[in-house]
C-alpha cells in the first residue's frame, strides 16, 4: 500500500486538527507581517520617517526578499523537507522583523525588510505544499482554506493594533511596537515546532520509505485508536515508483504534462499580485492621497479589515464543493469590478462598503488559488513548481509597488483601472489553461 493510499484512508481527526492549528499559526504571523505594511506605511510617511519614494522602496524591498526567499527556500524545500523549511523560515522572518522594528534610519528599515521578506515569501509556499501533501484529498481544499482563514484573521488584528498603537509613543514609536508583536508571535510559533511531522509523501519521494512508514504508522495508531484498530498494510511501496524514482528536476517543469501548468501559473502569479496587493498594501495611502486624515484612513481600513476572515471562510465552505478553477475565474472578475468601485468612491460609506466587499472577494480568491496551485505538480516537484511560479508574484509585487507610486500621480481611479485589467487577464488565463482538480488524489492530478 502506498503512502498516498494510507494518507487518503486516514479519518479526519485529532492529528489533522493539531497539524492545521500549528501550520495556521505560522500563516497568521506571515500575513500579519505582510499587511502591517499598509497600516504603518501611512504613519511612516506622515511622521517624515519615510518619503513616498522611500515607502515605495520599503514595500518593494519586502517583495524582492520574498522573491529571493521563494526561489531559494521555497524550491529548496524539495530537498530539505517541508518541516525543516517551515521551521527555518519562521526563524528567519521573526529575527529580521524584530531587528527591523529598531531600525535607526530609512535605509536600515528598507534593508532589513528585504531579509525579513525572504522568510515570509517562502513560508507561504511551504505551508501550501505541506498541507496539500499531508491532508487527504477529500478535505484538501477545505484545509488549505482554513490556514488562509487563520492567516487573514491577522488583517483585522494588524489593523486594530495599528489604530491603537501607531498614534502613540511609549519608549519608542507606535509603529515599532506593531512590528515587535508580529516578530514575537512568530518566535512563539517556532517554539511549538516539535509537534510537526515531516511530510510522509516527501519522505517517500526521497526514497526514505522507512521514515515515511514510521510516521504513517504513528498517525494510523493515533487516528484509529478510538476504534481499536489501524489500517492494515503489507509494507509501504512508493507511488512514485510508477513515475520517477529520482528527485525532480527544475527542467521537468518545462516538459509535458507540466509545461502548460507552469506557463499558466507564471502568467497568473505575475498578474494576480497586481490586483491583490495593489489594494491590500496601498489602501491607507490611497485614502491619504484623497485628503483623508491619517486617523480616519486607519479607521476606515480597520472597518474594512474586519471582514477579512470571511473570504477564506467562504473558501473553506465552497472549496471542495465548487470547482476551484471556475471559482478563481469568477472571483478575479469580481475583484476587478469592485476595485473600480472603490477607486471611484468618495463618500465614507461607499469607501468602506466597496472596500469591505473588495477585501472579502480578494481573500476568498487568495484562499482558492493557494489550494489550486499546490495541486499542479507531483510531490518530487511540488515545492519547486509552486516556489518557482509563486516567485513571479513576489517579483511582480515589487515592481507593482514602484509602478503604483508612479501611476498614483494621475489619480486613484487610474490605479484601479490598471488593477482591473490585470485581474481580467488572470480570469482569462485560468479559464483557458487551468485544469480541473476537485475530488482527485494528488497523484492523479500530477499525471
Over which residues does each language-model region extend?
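Transmembrane-helix signature of 12-pass secondary carriers
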Residues: 1-447
Amino acid at each position: 500500500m502506498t503512502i498516498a493510499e494510507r494518507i487518503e484512508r486516514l479519518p479526519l481527526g485529532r492529528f489533522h486538527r493539531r497539524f492545521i492549528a500549528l501550520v495556521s499559526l505560522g500563516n497568521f504571523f506571515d500575513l500579519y507581517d505582510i499587511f502591517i505594511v499598509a497600516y504603518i506605511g501611512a504613519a511612516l510617511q506622515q511622521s517624515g520617517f519615510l518619503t513616498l519614494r522611500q515607502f515605495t522602496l520599503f514595500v518593494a524591498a519586502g517583495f524582492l526578499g520574498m522573491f529571493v526567499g521563494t526561489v531559494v527556500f521555497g524550491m529548496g524545500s524539495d530537498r530539505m523537507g517541508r518541516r525543516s523549511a517551515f521551521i527555518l523560515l519562521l526563524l528567519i522572518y521573526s529575527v529580521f522583523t524584530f531587528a527591523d522594528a529598531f531600525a535607526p534610519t530609512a535605509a536600515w528599515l528598507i534593508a532589513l525588510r528585504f531579509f525579513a521578506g525572504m522568510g515570509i515569501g517562502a513560508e507561504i509556499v511551504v505551508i501550501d505544499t505541506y498541507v496539500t501533501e499531508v491532508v487527504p484529498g477529500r478535505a484538501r481544499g477545505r484545509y488549505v482554506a482554513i490556514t488562509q482563514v487563520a492567516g487573514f484573521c491577522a488583517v483585522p488584528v494588524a489593523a486594530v493594533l495599528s489604530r491603537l498603537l501607531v498614534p502613540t509613543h511609549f519608549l519608542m514609536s507606535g509603529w515599532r511596537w506593531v512590528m515587535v508583536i508580529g516578530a514575537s508571535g512568530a518566535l512563539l510559533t517556532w517554539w511549538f515546532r516539535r509537534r510537526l511531522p515531516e511530510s510522509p509523501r516527501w519522505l517517500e519521494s526521497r526514497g526514505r520509505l522507512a521514515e515515511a512508514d514510521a510516521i504513517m504508522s504513528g498517525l494510523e495508531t493515533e487516528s484509529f485508536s478510538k476504534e481499536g484498530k489501524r489500517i492494515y498494510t503489507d509494507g509501504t511501496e512508493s507511488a512514485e515508483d510508477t513515475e520517477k524514482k529520482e528527485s525532480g528536476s527544475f527542467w521537468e517543469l518545462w516538459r509535458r504534462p507540466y509545461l502548460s501548468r507552469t506557463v499558466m501559473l507564471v502568467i497568473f502569479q505575475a498578474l494576480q499580485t497586481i490586483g491583490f496587493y495593489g489594494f491590500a498594501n496601498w489602501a491607507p495611502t490611497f485614502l491619504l492621497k484623497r485628503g483623508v486624515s491619517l486617523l480616519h484612513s486607519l479607521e476606515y481600513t480597520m472597518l474594512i479589515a474586519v471582514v477579512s476572515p470571511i473570504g477564506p471562510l467562504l473558501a473553506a465552505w465552497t472549496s471542495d464543493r465548487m470547482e476551484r478553477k471556475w471559482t478563481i475565474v469568477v472571483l478575479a472578475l469580481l475583484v476587478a469590478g469592485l476595485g473600480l468601485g472603490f477607486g471611484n468612491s468618495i463618500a465614507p460609506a461607499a469607501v468602506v462598503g466597496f472596500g469591505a466587499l473588495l477585501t472579502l472577494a480578494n481573500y476568498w480568491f487568495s484562499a482558492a488559488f493557494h489550494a489550486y496551485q499546490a495541486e499542479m505538480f507531483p510531490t518530487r516537484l511540488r515545492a519547486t513548481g509552486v516556489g518557482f511560479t509563486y516567485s513571479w508574484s513576489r517579483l511582480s509585487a515589487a515592481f507593482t509597488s514602484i509602478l503604483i507610486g508612479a501611476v498614483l500621480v494621475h489619480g486613484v481611479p487610474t490605479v484601479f483601472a490598471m488593477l482591473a485589467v490585470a485581474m481580467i487577464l488572470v480570469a482569462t488565463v485560468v479559464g483557458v489553461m487551468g485544469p480541473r482538480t476537485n475530488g482527485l488524489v494528488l497523484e492523479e492530478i500530477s499525471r
